[in-house]
Swiss-Prot record:
Subcellular localization: Mitochondrion inner membrane
Subunit record text: Fungal cytochrome b-c1 complex contains 10 subunits; 3 respiratory subunits, 2 core proteins and 5 low-molecular weight proteins. Cytochrome b-c1 complex is a homodimer.
Membrane disposition: Multi-pass membrane protein
Gene3D superfamilies noted in UniProt: Cytochrome Bc1 Complex, Chain C (1.20.810.10)
Chief location bin: mitochondrion
Gene Ontology cellular component list: mitochondrial inner membrane; respiratory chain complex III
UniProt GO BP: mitochondrial electron transport, ubiquinol to cytochrome c
Family: Belongs to the cytochrome b family.
Protein's name in the database: Cytochrome b
Keywords from the UniProt entry: Electron transport, Heme, Iron, Membrane, Metal-binding, Mitochondrion, Mitochondrion inner membrane, Respiratory chain, Transmembrane, Transmembrane helix, Transport, Ubiquinone
Note: Heme 1 (or BL or b562) is low-potential and absorbs at about 562 nm, and heme 2 (or BH or b566) is high-potential and absorbs at about 566 nm.
UniProt cofactor note: Binds 2 heme b groups non-covalently.
Amino acid sequence: MRIFKSHPLLRLVNSYVIDSPTPSNLSYLWNFGSLLALCLIIQIVTGVTLAMHYTPSVAEAFNSVEHIMRDVNNGWLIRYLHANTASAFFFLVYLHVGRGIYYGSYKAPRTLTWIIGSIILIVMMATAFLGYVLPYGQMSLWGATVITNLMSAIPWIGQDIVEFLWGGFSVNNATLNRFFALHFVLPFVLAALVIMHLISYHETVGSGNPLGISSNYDRLPFAPYYIFKDLITIFLFFFVLSLFVFFMPNALGDSENYVMANPMQTPPAIVPEWYLLPFYAILRSIPNKLLGVIAMFSAILIILVMPITDLSKYRGLQFRPLSKVAFYVFVANFLILMQLGAKHVESPFIEFGQISTVLYFSHFLVIMPLVSFIENTLVELITKKS
């Protein structure tokens, strides 16, 4: 249609969604972008709706959530959609990042896209933490207390920062108000970052492909081919999300959060949501509080160094067997850290956590550069012989 190429706004839609030249050999691993966009839309719509009925007050927050569940038309559906889509969002983001690591999406000329994506992940984690505090159940209160208290590890000014975050000497009304305000605003910041992510992705060389080579020789328009391909995974996503929302809405939550927050009673174990467990395990595996906090934040930020530490001359791990083994060991280790984050701080979980933490950082700082150097050397030796 001619209007799609002449109208200033529709021309943008056309260049990004309709005529965008896309490699012809993309697998379903390239479908996460559309699913993540869908998750963000669901979160913003359900979040704004929930905010209309929520009261950010220590006395009323828990009751207002119960009011949403019992009295608001389809309030239970909106809340469970919001909670379970948050888990789906993180699950898909981890797959998206894993795909990026496997296929070398962090290498030039896509480094800026990778950096913006990493910032999106950090903002997502901050937003999720703020949101987890809002129902003001036991886990909300004590999770907020533990995580904000991490700032007290900063020498000299740490305690002042904690009290500044709380707006008092403990988690109180001021804390809940500011957490609610930030949790409401950050998804829109996230949407802006996603647009930046898309612009940087389209303005460089566009999508990569499973072979890790230039795809300029064989491209297809995004519509209708990849729109239909995206729709397949979107329908599958709705099916799986519906199973959780309608049949097991609390499977990924914590039963302690159905108990009203009580500052006088500590829950048996303070555990964050499953998607933050690997980083919580790294925090707890280091006895020194300050070093633990530094390690936890470094574990998130370390993906930013990948464009520097990957010395390979080749994009992706498809044709690099040693790097493939290292990648699968890293994935297994990440899943082990996720399990350890939910365990009590006792032997042997402490020791396993320390081993897994060392292995996690070693992958980025030692194993990746070493393995890529060995592979480069082997390829050079073979090409010289031939």
